[in-house]
Amino acid sequence: MNSHKKEEWEEISSIGSCNSKSRVLKCRKKNGLIENEKVDIVAVKIINKKFFKRNETDILEKIRLFNIPRYYSHAEDDNYIYIYMEYIEDKKQLRFKESEIISMIADLTETLSFLHKHQILHRDIKPSNIILDKNGVLKLIDFGSSIIDQQQDDGDNICKESSFAITGTHTYMAPEVKKLHRSTKKSDVWSLGCTVLEIVGGNPKKIFDGIPIIPNHVSEIMVDFIKRCLIIDPNKRSHMEELLTHRLISSMVGQNKNRENNIEPKFNNDYLSSKFPERFAPRFEKPKWEIEFNELKFNKDDTVGGDGFFSVVKKGYYNETEVAIKLIKKAHGENVTVCDTFYHEVLIISNLRHPNIVQFIAACIKFDNKEVNHCIVSEWMSGGNLSQFISNERKILEINPHLRVKILLDIAKGMLYSHRQGIIHRDLTSNNVLLNFRKKKLLNNNSSNNDEQFYDSDEIIAKVCDFGLSSNQSESKKLRGGSIHYMAPENLNGSPINEKSDIYSFGLLVWQMFSYASPNTIYSPKEMASMVSDEKLNYRPQIPFNVPLKFKELITQCWDRNPLNRPKDFSEIIDKLKDINQIYFQDNSNASTISSTAITTTISTISISNSGNSSYSTSDDSSTYGSGFYNSGFL
């Protein structure tokens, strides 16, 4: 192998730093080509000698594989080691086809299997150590943590060289490495599982019972592959060779790689992720709902439907249709947490279709470094949110009490659909229910007061919105989040949650429909959290004394401390509301039997605040728990 002196090279640009101990430069040979290589441009990894491990050059010199950058030579001076390698002109793309994703997984698994056959452990497998060249070929890089296993065993024995040092990236590190500080070939298998999980839109940091949570949208065949990697006991974990025979990739490895794959697992969604570095951000075929920002038109008066810390909702037009446009504020457009939550909401709502869930229309996902225009486009709801309606249109509810049942039925139907899709809302509040209604005056012939407005149930429709904090049922086991005043005790205490937590929040909505107050006007978030979560205090707001008995029963059952005592699901709540409707509102003439000012709050200390003219309002910043991202959900 030819040696090279650093004086023979001129720096073109910085490619980046692998860590604080090394950096990589793009360089050109000053005089001609590298002998026998026919190239004049290389990647030079410069490593501080204090942190250099001879393993890296020994391994790179030993292996020759299409999916590993070619090693040319290395040099050194008093302070640094210079490793000269093949320069990879990476392919910058952000969306991949399903078949491309499977091909990448196959390439990565085959590469790792090759290394293990030669007794090499990589020990730092993660998305940032994978790049694609300009032809889309996967390359595994950064062998700074790698070692050669001298024991020549079956892969289960521990490598002596790694016995007393943690090496790798914690998020992708196998349990036995974290606990025992020791690596095996099976440790690479765990890291592979975490990497594949992230490629298909999961988050290895979200863990339950020691194992990263696999999102519901991942296909069964992909789930099986990942699960074979993510087994806590390394003795039960698959070998790389075994993974090569898995039906997900077996027909794409070796001679079959260029043949049409007989198994084409269908992903249920397009997967979105901002966790990867720019050189390897996963990209999939552009979904039908993705649009360009210039396709949107905004109202001339720049109507604002709601303004929050991280985003703003504006009224606009898409294809000459009135829409609500929720934009991430430019100051937060590059915030990873904000963008992740945005992508998460798009992923969920783009697959929900129900009359009582705000209709998602499109989204703009702008990755241009010069300008960030992330936005969600949905139907425009002219009636504002339920919190505003309760506060500003109290008289309508008093004159038309049957509308309470209609609104609550709409919410329950939307939530039932959501739960049956495996989605837990986790932030069901009056701010996250939007209304459409027409103030069409229907004069009551029996009424002498022509100012009274009477509505048919068909005149109003309620829809659930803001799924930014939502999660699938497998992910929600120990995740906390939402508006504290509506949060169930088990959520506040960090206990496992499920759809019963949404039912608890629904109980507070029913209470709010009669008290005309918001839970957050009574106590501060900290006080409310302490009082609700405390088993002895077990605080709930006071139910007005003249609320009809059936409604009282529904409220107390929904917000029962024990989730098992709450309604089994929203279908049971719907049945109860239908029964209430028949008992109290058999016809419009009976509507007045429990109407008028008789139904008022008995809590004199509660002050009702006017939410203003905004159609999409936000709640207090401090009432949101968990990610710190939402005021009322995403806003």
Swiss-Prot record:
Pfam family, one: PK_Tyr_Ser-Thr
Catalysed reaction, written as an equation: L-seryl-[protein] + ATP = O-phospho-L-seryl-[protein] + ADP + H(+); L-threonyl-[protein] + ATP = O-phospho-L-threonyl-[protein] + ADP + H(+); L-tyrosyl-[protein] + ATP = O-phospho-L-tyrosyl-[protein] + ADP + H(+)
A single cellular component GO annotation: cytoplasm
Keywords: ATP-binding, Developmental protein, Kinase, Nucleotide-binding, Phosphoprotein, Repeat, Serine/threonine-protein kinase, Transferase, Tyrosine-protein kinase
Biological process annotations from GO: cAMP-mediated signaling; regulation of cell fate specification; regulation of gene expression; signal transduction; sorocarp morphogenesis; sporulation resulting in formation of a cellular spore
Protein residues bound to ATP: 15-23, 45, 305-313, 326
Function noted in UniProt: Positive regulator of gsk3/gskA activity required for cell pattern formation and a downstream effector of carC. The kinases, gsk3/gskA, zakA and zak2, form part of a signaling pathway that responds to extracellular cyclic AMP. The pathway has a role in transcriptional regulation; required to direct prespore/spore fates during development. Zak2 negatively regulates prestalk differentiation by regulating expression of ecmA.
UniProt family annotation: In the N-terminal section; belongs to the protein kinase superfamily. Ser/Thr protein kinase family. In the C-terminal section; belongs to the protein kinase superfamily. TKL Tyr protein kinase family.
Entry protein name: Dual specificity protein kinase zak2
Naturally occurring in which organism (per UniProt): Dictyostelium discoideum
Taxonomic placement: Eukaryota, Amoebozoa, Evosea, Eumycetozoa, Dictyostelia
